């Protein structure tokens, strides 16, 4: 469960290391985001020669949460960190590599590029 002010790791090679959620998209009073939801983030920590720099505001999709997600068969998948992948204005990832596992819940038409770049899909 990601909410406003939550800090997330970045699971791609866009150049950002840490981002902070500034808005959960999808409704005027929506409070929480889970895996597969799009949020508005600001870059808090970045590497020197990356595609993004500190202070940039962009969209991101949540790919891992500590809270976890429940599957229809009753199983729960939790991760050790909260992580997101940065998106451009067309909702496509700006990075060319994804680090760490992602979940099958991202397998919608919108995020198939992330699934194909990920090293492991749980």
From Swiss-Prot:
BP GO terms, sorted: translation
Record keyword rRNA-binding present: yes
One Gene Ontology term of the molecular function aspect: structural constituent of ribosome
Key words of the record: Ribonucleoprotein, Ribosomal protein, RNA-binding, rRNA-binding
Gene Ontology CC: cytosolic large ribosomal subunit
Keyword Ribonucleoprotein: yes
PROSITE patterns according to UniProt: RIBOSOMAL_L14 (PS00049)
Record family assignment: Belongs to the universal ribosomal protein uL14 family.
Role noted for this protein: Binds to 23S rRNA. Forms part of two intersubunit bridges in the 70S ribosome.
Subunit relationships: Part of the 50S ribosomal subunit. Forms a cluster with proteins L3 and L19. In the 70S ribosome, L14 and L19 interact and together make contacts with the 16S rRNA in bridges B5 and B8.
Official protein name in the record: Large ribosomal subunit protein uL14
């Amino acid at each position: 469960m990601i909410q406003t002010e939550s800090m997330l790791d970045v699971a791609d090679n866009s150049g950002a290391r840490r981002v902070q959620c500034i808005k959960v998209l999808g409704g005027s009073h929506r409070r929480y985001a889970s895996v597969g939801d799009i949020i508005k983030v600001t870059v808090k920590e970045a590497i020197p020669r990356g595609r993004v720099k500190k202070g940039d505001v962009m969209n991101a999709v949540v790919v891992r949460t500590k809270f976890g997600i429940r599957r229809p068969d009753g199983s729960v998948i939790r991760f050790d960190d909260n992580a997101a992948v940065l998106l451009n204005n067309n909702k496509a990832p700006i990075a060319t590599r994804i680090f760490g596992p992602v979940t099958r819940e991202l397998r919608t038409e919108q995020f198939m590029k992330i699934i194909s770049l990920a090293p492991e899909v749980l």
